[in-house]
Amino acid sequence: MKPSFKDEKALWEYIRPRLRGRMWSRVETICPDGMFDAHAFFGQSQIWLELKVGKPSIKALRPSQHSFLIELVRHDQPAWTCFGCRGEVLFFEGLDFDTAVVPPFYRPSIARS
């Protein structure tokens, strides 16, 4: 049976046990051009992950999220957008919203206990 994603919290609860690796941060911050890296935004210590429910599209991002995603890509940081759409989990890397991929940190199936 396919999962149902009524909101971003439901999507997060579904994917969280399937994620492995580094610290996760949402793409919610704006880092103005020229701002020093005071909060280690670009330190390779975390994977930036934004969650959305609905049809995959760059238009799903708020303008501040889109701007920050551009900065992450510009600084060669791992940044992904995950969409929960019609019972499927779709990941898009960086600014490429045309091709869904399975990232190395995601295990689509988890062992049942």
Where are these predicted regions, by residue range?
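Acidic-basic catalytic patches of nuclease active cores, encompassing PD-(D/E)XK
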Residues: 1-29
